[in-house]
Amino acid sequence: MPLYRKRLRLVRGEGVYVWDEKGRRYLDLIAGIGVNVLGHAHPEWVLDMSRQLEKIVVAGPMFEHDEREEMLEELSHWVDYEYVYMGNSGTEAVEAAIKFARLATGRSEIVAMTNAFHGRTLGSLSATWKKKYREGFGPLVPGFKHIPFNNVEAAKEAITKETAAVIFEPIQGEGGIVPADEEFVKTLRDLTEDVGALLIADEVQSGLRTGKFLAIEHYGVRPDIVTMGKGIGNGFPVSLTLTDLEIPRGKHGSTFGGNPLACRAVATTLRILRRDRLVEKAGEKFMEFSGERVVKTRGRGLMIGIVLRRPAGNYVKALQERGILVNTAGNRVIRLLPPLIIEGDTLEEARKEIEGVLNDIL
């Protein structure tokens, strides 16, 4: 289906590199938009997934299986939420979070942020900000309103006893790799507690990348609900909604959510991340970029945004021609979301090449 423009055709990947149909190699600094945290074709992950395919793939949500228990055990090394609801994509995790918030509070109003991105299904799209994603799909789900990101006074005015939940990204991804201010996050936590509303942290993109399992950990704040996706399964479609809320059995479900193959993907990914300390190491790999056309560098760890004085599109194309894959996050931001396995010297070489392109192209 012609939903996307024709672009580079990739045929295989290994580690931090991918190859096109002509055999040309590219350094992959976008990793499927933050998905392939272990890189491409990680041998241990591939072996575990291959063995699982020969064992059992889908069992249905009404049955127990060892893979789920193993996944929960691995997850317990990172977080201590009481309940984990599994889906197949980040947008499903957000949909679940919205449902849970409305069910738990008996309220319908959801406060979201300007420049936020939470997904493209109807509920998550209602929390998403950009007009280009929303246009043509109205009317969207009622009860959503947006406030300026990092604006404490706007939050104080918007969050009331009518609010079911506030949803935000600790680091806005599509919005330009913009970290939340500490005062803003703590204000959201205080305000939601004061009025009996819930705080939802969307970690679909920021999870795993900032030096901590969840980016929200940098703020010393515990959300009521956390959504995860993308890298949590290293490329296999899976998502998690984490909460201490007890949702009545049967109120939410998924045919494929929590299937044995998905649980295997998460369990193996988390095991490798923990053993090799890849999450902690990612926090040490943040890079600053400089040059006449660079305004500043934003982000944490391996979630990096290079803010430019000019539109980023031409630079993205030029980097592809030189064998480096990146993408944009807004009109003037180059986004880097490399695999967590990337080595420091490879990153340094990439930084020099990127700065060279930024300086060469008018």
Swiss-Prot record:
It comes from the Archaea. Pyridoxal 5'-phosphate binds at residues 90-91, 117, 202-205, 255. The modification N6-(pyridoxal phosphate)lysine is found at residue 230. Pfam families: Aminotran_3. It catalyses: [amino-group carrier protein]-C-terminal-gamma-(L-lysyl)-L-glutamate + 2-oxoglutarate = [amino-group carrier protein]-C-terminal-N-(1-carboxy-5-oxopentan-1-yl)-L-glutamine + L-glutamate; [amino-group carrier protein]-C-terminal-gamma-(L-ornithyl)-L-glutamate + 2-oxoglutarate = [amino-group carrier protein]-C-terminal-gamma-(L-glutamyl-5-semialdehyde)-L-glutamate + L-glutamate. Its cofactor is pyridoxal 5'-phosphate. One of its GO terms (biological process) is arginine biosynthetic process via ornithine. GO terms for cellular component: cytoplasm. Gene3D superfamilies: Aspartate Aminotransferase, domain 1, Type I PLP-dependent aspartate aminotransferase-like (Major domain). Its main location: cytoplasm. Its EC number is 2.6.1.118, 2.6.1.124. Transmembrane segments: none annotated. InterPro entries: AcOrn/SuccOrn_fam, Aminotrans_3, Aminotrans_3_PPA_site, Class-III_PLP-dep_AT, LysJ, PyrdxlP-dep_Trfase, PyrdxlP-dep_Trfase_major, PyrdxlP-dep_Trfase_small. It is an enzyme of class 2 (transferase). SUPFAM superfamilies: PLP-dependent transferases. Binds 1 pyridoxal phosphate per subunit. It is found in: Cytoplasm. Disulfide bonds: none annotated. Substrate binds at residues 120, 254. NCBIfam families: argD, PRK04013.1. PANTHER family: ACETYLORNITHINE AMINOTRANSFERASE, MITOCHONDRIAL, AMINOTRANSFERASE CLASS III. Homodimer. Belongs to the class-III pyridoxal-phosphate-dependent aminotransferase family. LysJ subfamily. Involved in both the arginine and lysine biosynthetic pathways. May also have succinyldiaminopimelate aminotransferase activity, thus carrying out the corresponding step in lysine biosynthesis. This is Putative [LysW]-aminoadipate semialdehyde/glutamate semialdehyde transaminase.
